[in-house]
Amino acid sequence: MIQRRDFLLASVSTGLCALAGPAFADKANPDKLRIALLPDENAATIIQNAQPLKAYLEGVLKKPVEIIVTTDYSSMIEAMRFGRIEVGYFGPFSYVLAKSKATEIEPFGVGVEKGKPNYQSILIATADGPVKEIADIKGKPFAFGDRASTSSHLAPRALLAKKGLIGDADYKVVHLGQHDAVARAVAAGQVPAGALSEAIYRVLVETKKVDPAKLRQIALSDPIPNYPLTMQGYLKPELKDAIRKAFLELKDPAILKLFRVEAIAAATDKDYDVLRDMAKVLQLDIAKL
């Protein structure tokens, strides 16, 4: 079972602090909209990059907006489950987990990149290390991100399984939490190989947070449905429509850059059945995660 954890919340006025319980008498039409973003990079960086989104939504929705970054994926699932946030930007698999525990959650948007609503996981290795191809991973440590991450755990682990490599049997599973932690650890030679979102990897290279000369690409996963934007099903219809419209009509590249996409399209729960199928390949019981 997922344990309740504290998570970080950040806003311009309050900074980082502990998140309290339900804050509004009217859950269906709260005075303030709390939006959670995944902790797939440093929280302070995410908060800083989210300020244009905050300003845009406050202008469109005519409500104060609080940007929240949880300490991990499980904390975000719990926050959505217990009504501590109204909108959540989940990873594909963390959304599937959240939906299994709170069926009223509604996906309403998905990022579009290069004309497609999907992305890939990239498997990388230390450039001068022992891993040159997938087969070389056998008998060695392999770094994943958060356990509930799609591109930094579920998808690459399923890819390795299809290649005959089973975690903790054929290689040692190492979880480092965040995508950037995986890239840095592999670049430094602390682990010989690992996996993360290809989109995040590109950003880390472009911003010179990792040196591509120290890394080797060994594989890409099959396309994965992109991160879904979700909201609480109990919100009043007028507010849900306004939230949906605000995101689907987003055109500002400075805001879309936060999501690493060029546009946001409509999404449905059925779009994520491929993740449920992937979990079956790995013999994961979603209800018990």
Segments predicted by a language model, with ranges:
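Bilobed "Venus flytrap"/periplasmic-binding protein-like clamshell domains
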Residues: I35-G59, T70, F93, P117-A183, ...
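Short beta-strand->loop
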Residues: I105-G115, Y171-K172, V205-P223
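A ligand-binding cleft/hinge motif common to bilobed small-molecule-binding domains
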Residues: P92-A102, A161-K162, A187, P192-P212
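N-terminal secretory signal peptides and thylakoid transit peptides that target proteins
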Residues: M1-G15
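Acidic, polar ligand-binding/catalytic clefts
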Residues: E78-D136
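An extracytoplasmic/periplasmic, membrane-proximal ligand-sensing/linker region
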Residues: K27-P52, I224-N226, T230-L289
